Design a protein with these regions (language model features):
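Bacterial N-terminal signal peptides that target proteins for export
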Residues: 1-8
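Bacterial N-terminal signal peptides
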Residues: 8-18
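Bacterial Sec-dependent signal peptides at the C-terminal "C-region" and cleavage site
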Residues: 17-26
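Surface-exposed, charged secondary-structure patches
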Residues: 24, 70-136
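Short, aromatic-enriched amphipathic alpha-helices that serve as compact interaction elements
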Residues: 30-50
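Stable alpha-helical elements in mature extracytoplasmic
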Residues: 34-38, 69, 73, 77, ...
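Surface-exposed patches in mature extracellular/periplasmic domains of secreted proteins
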Residues: 49-58
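Low-complexity, intrinsically disordered terminal/linker segments enriched in charged
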Residues: 120-142, 150, 157-182
Length: 182
């Protein structure tokens, strides 16, 4: 009888573990899903930016993005970007706030963008994004978005630009905070 109970307990335990594993995506599948989200965003954003340039309306891609893709950004990042955009609109003709594209870490747009290495860091993922210029992928990432999976979807929480001699310029949140102080 004792052997029978042990056998039944093992069967129930194995079904329970299997069900839990089926509900929890693996780190590998999460990373792939995250990378797919980032690639889709950059495909959309590059097309939006190109359309803005053709209309001779630089900067409007950021406005369109904040309007149409706001659910893709953390509240902190969205607030900082909206505040920066509002400050720059108050002083047309002057460079106020961000003087580069915060999602591309550039002033010009590449032909296209490719997702590279995806690195889990705690409950966030850092995704390398490379610009392709004249058919050649940059050897170093142009930008490294940081993402989290919240409320059933991916959101950008920051954009990293690499090490510089000025640490405040190494990521979008710190750049926005520095500009707000100025």
């Amino acid at each position: 009888m004792k052997l029978y109970r042990t056998f039944i307990a093992l069967i129930l335990f194995s079904f329970g573990v299997g069900a839990l594993q089926a509900q929890t995506p693996t780190t590998s599948s999460q990373a792939q899903d995250c990378g797919h989200f980032v690639q889709q965003f950059y495909n959309w954003y590059a097309a939006t930016e190109n359309a803005s340039m053709k209309r001779n309306s630089p900067g409007s891609a950021l406005e369109v993005t904040l309007r149409e893709k706001r659910s893709s950004f953390s509240p902190e990042l969205l607030k900082g970007l909206k505040e920066d955009l509002a400050a720059s609109k108050k002083s047309p003709g002057e460079i106020v706030g961000l003087d580069f594209d915060p999602f591309l870490n550039a002033q010009d747009i590449a032909e296209r963008y490719l997702v590279g290495k995806i690195t889990p860091k705690g409950d966030h993922y850092w995704v390398e994004v490379f610009g392709v210029w004249n058919g050649q992928k940059h050897s170093n990432p142009d930008v490294v978005p940081e993402l989290a999976f919240e409320n059933g979807h991916w959101i950008f929480t920051n954009f990293h630009y690499g090490k510089t001699g000025i640490p405040v310029n190494e990521n979008l949140l710190s750049v926005l905070q520095g500009l707000k102080k100025d």
